[in-house]
């Protein structure tokens, strides 16, 4: 009995330590295996396709999002989300690219722009705007509009008042109204010397032109008598304004003549009515009884 002699047999063979450590799979290897298995699972099984009738398969466009590598899918999804958030801003910036250009960018409004703005703002027919020799626009002149005829050509801005015809800005309303009257309403003043094409907006420049170009001496004083109204004490600033003032007198005289004729006709009718004697009306007698008192 060998176990009594402490003989338990041959000792078990001891395993020698491994020479090399086993290689653990990395996360990239695991993701690659998952991607490969996903692709393999999507492949058709030949054993199941033997006894089946082939069906027509439509040619669908390749969708790259169905065959993504999981290692890069997260980054692509993040980029797609960022693009979806930025899409409204990009579209808004593209839509506003054409709105940056407008009439405010141009220092002067062209004739076509002025006609377009007038036709869009009002339902009336566009005014017949003409150009003079200096290229300034002449707006239609109508005395029936009254003293506020320049109001539709004046627009209030942050810096003052702007002429909508030539886009010039003045500090006061009276200044821009005078500008509209002189430069865009009254016709230009021409030089009366033969074969001279000089024109200007200011009457004083005509005298300077005649003195400098034609040697005509300047007048010693302003002849206010030629610009004085024969019907009242008014003195106009220019011959054109004097003609307008006299025309108003003629309109008033015509209205006064009409009113006088109406008054004469009314008084004649009243006199004819007074000459007619009123007809006598018969009054029936009213029977009266003496007062009676009953007790």
UniProtKB/Swiss-Prot annotation:
Which keywords does UniProt give here? Activator, Chromosome, Cytoplasm, DNA-binding, Metal-binding, Nucleus, Repeat, Repressor, Transcription, Transcription regulation, Zinc, Zinc-finger
InterPro entries associated with the record: Znf_C2H2_sf (IPR036236), Znf_C2H2_type (IPR013087)
- Summary of the knockout phenotype: RNAi-mediated knockdown on a daf-2 mutant background shortens lifespan substantially, by up to 45%, but does not alter lifespan on a daf-16 mutant or wild-type background. Knockdown activates vitellogenesis on either lin-29, rict-1 or sgk-1 mutant backgrounds, but not on daf-2 mutants. Reduced expression of metal transporter smf-3 on an nhr-14 mutant background. Enhanced sensitivity to P.aeruginosa infection on an nhr-14 mutant background.
Q: What does the UniProt entry say about where the protein is found?
A: Chromosome; Nucleus; Cytoplasm
- Key word Repeat present in the record? yes
Q: Name one GO cellular component term.
A: chromosome
Zinc finger (C2H2-type) stretch? 161-183, 227-249
Q: What is its main location?
A: nucleus
List, as start-end ranges, the regions of compositional bias called Low complexity: 10-22
GO terms (molecular function) for this protein are: chromatin insulator sequence binding; zinc ion binding
Q: Which residues are in coiled coils?
A: none
| Signal peptide interval | none
Annotated region Disordered: the residues are 1-23
Is Hydrolase one of the keywords UniProt gives this record?
no
Q: Please indicate which superkingdom the organism of origin belongs to.
A: Eukaryota
Q: What induces it?
A: Induced by paraquat, a chemical causing production of reactive oxygen species (ROS).
One GO biological process from the UniProt record? determination of adult lifespan
Per the record, the similarity remark reads: Belongs to the krueppel C2H2-type zinc-finger protein family.
Role this protein plays: Zinc finger transcription factor which acts as both a transcriptional activator and repressor. Binds to the promoters of genes that contain the 5'-CTTATCA-3' DNA consensus sequence in their regulatory region. Functions downstream of the Insulin/IGF-1-like signaling (IIS) mediated pathway. Involved in normal development, lifespan, stress response, lipid metabolism, innate immunity and exit from the developmentally arrested larval state known as dauer. Required for stress-induced expression of hsp-90 and resistance to heat stress, perhaps as part of a systemic stress signaling pathway.
Quaternary context: Interacts with ceh-60.
The protein depicted here goes by the name Zinc finger transcription factor pqm-1
Source organism of the structure:
Caenorhabditis elegans
